[in-house]
Amino acid sequence: MRETHRKVARTVSNVLALMDEDPDFTYAMSSAQQYAWLEQEHPDLFARMLQRIKEGRFIPVGGMWVESDNMLPTGESLIRQITFGMRYFREHLGVEPKGLWLPDSFGYCGAWPQIARRAGFEWFLTQKISWNDTTKFPHHSFEWEGIDGSRILTHFPPSDTYGSTVSMQELQYSQRNFLDKDLSRNAILLYGYSDGGGGPTREMVARIRRDHDLAGAPSIDFGTPDELFDRVRHDIVDEAPDETPVFKGELYLELHRATLTSQQEMKRGCRREENLLRTTEYLCAAASVFNPKYRYPREELDGIWKTLLLNQFHDILPGSAIAWVHRQARADYVRDIARLRDIAAEAGASIASVRDDADMRSNAAIVPYTAKNGDSWIARTAAVGTQDDDANGTDAVADESTIATTCDDGRIILDNGLLRAIIAPDGTVRSLIDLDNGHELVPDGSGIGHYELLRDEPYEWDAWDIQRDAFLSAEGIDDSHVERVTETKRGGATVHVSSTTDGVSIDACITLRAKSKSLEFRTKVDWRASERFLKVDIPMAIQADRAQYECQYGMVERPIQKNTRSDEAKYESCTHRFVRVADAGYAAAVVNASTYGSDVSPIHRNTASGPVRGTMIRLSLLSSPLYPDPNTDKGVHEFAWNVVADASMPAVLDEANRLNAAVLPAVPAFDPLAQLNPVDGVMVLDWVKLADDGSGDLILRVYEAVGGEAHARLAVNAALGKATVRECSIMEDARLDAELPAAFADGDPSVARTAQGAMLSLHPFQLATLRVSCGSDGGNTDGNESRSLR
């Protein structure tokens, strides 16, 4: 990071010198974080840059805090990249970028078009998909349609680079390669020495002057991204509305697949901090509503957010930075997670001091979604994290406890009346039966919990890539055995398993709890291997064509059977908290607490007893590349995942939220600030926070989670008085995109309506941001709505 600070200053200094020499030269720079460093460390240079910004020649683009990874962060993190970035651009630079500028991230999630449009963006630019190793993307100028149906104008530079030197070869390649020249003659060329190389040079600027209108060559000139997108919109949307190219779904990068796994501590730290921020911001908002003496720690929370957003940069969170950067990021996570726990405790104590009904719960979590109506956003003594208690914190009665039986042949049977698991002496689960319907989840001859090592020796891009042929080199860790069986505190039973091979030691706990339809796996891995990649097998006796993977604000389906080259290229894919497979009559899912990489493939083999069919899910746990950090992930790591039987979508979301919710030593239980009472469908209230403007209003983030229509009534805490609610943009203002569906089915989305009982209506995977304003009779509102929030 220290060198990045210097790179920013060198590049801006170089660019400003070029602007002094050439009155037509323009330059675009993204990332509010870069401008903030420059403002703090080089105020004279910053002042010179501001003048060029006012002239329209130095062009802030992107509107984000940094050019983040786009597959791994939560949807809320992507939103905060925008809100923090745009706030800085507005307040410090006096501009509002119109488009997302992400030339170098490793894939783009299917929620981006909706997030971008609901933030007010008009266009999206990247060139990274041109790096695909298997197929060529079909367009350069098109409308990208997200999982919810939102569309955003998108352009890929046909030069297939973000670091052109403006050579004639590059210009001719760009013209020849442009796939949409039947509709448009306009494209962008990103030039300059990139990745900290200093930007454009005099020679490059001179080439643009020389080749501006050269006969027989593409015409080239200085311009701005907004000018380019105005032309592209005119060409492919306004002039040819019936021929506008459209691409729907995620932009999967057929490369850099190992970034879903490299530097696991980056993934675990990010997931933990995101979940803890959700709980902490909620408790701080509640303390502000309930207690007029509470001072909302806005500045400190903003600082923690900015550090998290920086650590989501597209080489840090994916695990492809140098060792020093990852050491600093790990220290950031440790420090900020500890501070967030303290802030949450302070807010909880403030609530308890003024609310007689705020019962303090020990070792508790606030779960944002539960399948049981009325349980969400209420502190509950939690099984998540510690795995010591059941979800309600009550002792299980004897006849509902899990019974563990050790057989003469060494097998162990766990039975809780809902599930029966049979664990072989080698520690793999050879049978898992749903006792409600007799469904066997494990294919014949297979075992859940078998670990495999792949050779991690990619042709290039060591920490970035895992090759397809690495999957052919998989070797099982067969030195594995059951060590003992123990009882949990509240009626469950745990089988302890040990597995070892050269450089790898694995201690696993397999637990079946009372009254649960999930089999839990808690694994500690001592990882000393080099150039190896660790996966765990989870075979399912379910024949399915496609698997469902959670992503930001919804899920995506990817093929299990690889019929096309594009299908084959998706041999390692991103999943957030769950992956689910289903046939016509049954579904199962795997829910995780900190992993992102996975592969899903068909099981198809013939045995003497008959054909065996099913689906193999494998979670990617650890990798060990030598570059750029030769000690990647050396050390001890802990993982948690659950196999969910009879996995309806509400049940899977419930399990995913419980497993990932932040567990705190003490949390006050009180009526939620806001809650959704479902009418039909699956709608999730994902985040509750105070508005950024210090007004004291609440901001609610809701979305439809499973791809169907959903209706729910909003309920708000009585302390908010006769509160009103209206829909707002992601920027928390009233500027709504008229082309996107509204959250309320009964009228103008910008009109304030009574919050209590307001009916929400969302389309598949629709996201909505709601602003709840306290009534004059509400709790601690003092009329001017300041309430010590600053």
Model-derived features: positions:
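Conserved, mostly hydrophobic/aromatic
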Residues: 85, 100, 116, 224, ...
